[in-house]
Amino acid sequence: IAGFVNETALFRNQWQFRPEVLTDGTKEDDEQFKDRIRPILREQLASTKAEGLLIPQVVYGYFAANGDGDDLVLWTDGTRTTELARMSFPRQQAEPFLCIADFFRPLDGPWDGAGEIDYAAFHIVTMGAAISERAAELFAADKYQDYLLLHGLGVEMAESLAEYWH
C-alpha cells in the first residue's frame, strides 16, 4: 500500500514541509525536496510497522439504486420496496447542470430506463483504530510534530488503500 502514497500530498499538505533554499540561492526542485523528506517517510513506516499501528481493512458492497432528482436512493434489495438510504448531492451551477444522481437510472419519469433498477458500488477503507489512538495520545502529550507526522501518514495510507482497492 505504501507504494501508492501520494508523496506530494503527504509531504506538502499533511506534513507541511516546503522546499528549502539551497546555498546557491535557488530552491530545491521537486526531486531534491522529496529526496530530503523520504527518510522521514521510511522512518515513520518502519515505526508504525514495528508498533503494529497500520491495520488496513476494506468493506465493499453493491446496492440496488435509482436516481431521484438530486438524490441517490439506495434500496434494501432488488424489489425496491424499502429505502435503505437516500443521499443528496449538489447539482452543478453551470451547464450542463449535472448531479451524481443523474448517472443512475431514474426512479420514474419519461426518460429511458426510468423505473428500472440500477446498482451503486461503494467501498470504505480504514487503516484501523490503533493509528488514530496513537495520534490522539501524541496530541494530548503536546508532541505536535510527532502527531502531525503520524496523523498525516495515517490519512495518506488510507487514501493509498482506497486507490489500491479501486
Language-model features: locations:
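Active-site loops and adjacent core secondary-structure elements that bind or stabilize anionic groups
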Residues: 1-148, 152
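C-terminal substrate/ligand-recognition segments
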Residues: 146-166
